[in-house]
Amino acid sequence: MARSIKKGPFVDDHVAKKVAAESAGSKKVIKTWSRRSTITPDFIGLTFAVHNGKKFIPVFVTENMVGHKLGEFAPTRTFHGHAADKKSKLKKK
């Protein structure tokens, strides 16, 4: 279910304070663990270091990211491909 419009987008307080302190286009990266925060128009032009569970992924916010969550742009899982079929490898030799 979608969030109620009257509540507005969710942004963690500590992220909102850091964004208010920074100016747009500044080179300083805002480090955050808050993957659940919604990207608002105030975030445009800022770079966030979003934690993916292991390391921080740099995310530069653009206009078309508004309304999405920060965590959507820092994948948590890596796909290394499906396991190879051992039987087919033996037949080829």
Curated annotation (Swiss-Prot):
Instruction: Fetch the InterPro entries from UniProt.
Output: Ribosomal_uS19, Ribosomal_uS19_bac-type, Ribosomal_uS19_CS, Ribosomal_uS19_SF
> Is Ribonucleoprotein one of the keywords?
yes
Q: Which GO terms describe its molecular function?
A: rRNA binding; structural constituent of ribosome
The protein's matches in PROSITE patterns, at most eight in alphabetical order, are given as: RIBOSOMAL_S19
The UniProt keywords, alphabetically, are: Ribonucleoprotein, Ribosomal protein, RNA-binding, rRNA-binding
Could you tell me which Gene3D superfamilies the record lists for this protein?
30s Ribosomal Protein S19, Chain A
Q: Which GO BP terms, alphabetically?
A: ribosomal small subunit assembly; translation
Q: Which GO terms describe its cellular component?
A: cytoplasm; small ribosomal subunit
Q: What does this protein do?
A: Protein S19 forms a complex with S13 that binds strongly to the 16S ribosomal RNA.
The entry assigns this protein to a family as follows: Belongs to the universal ribosomal protein uS19 family.
Can you say what this protein is called? Small ribosomal subunit protein uS19
Gene symbol?
rpsS
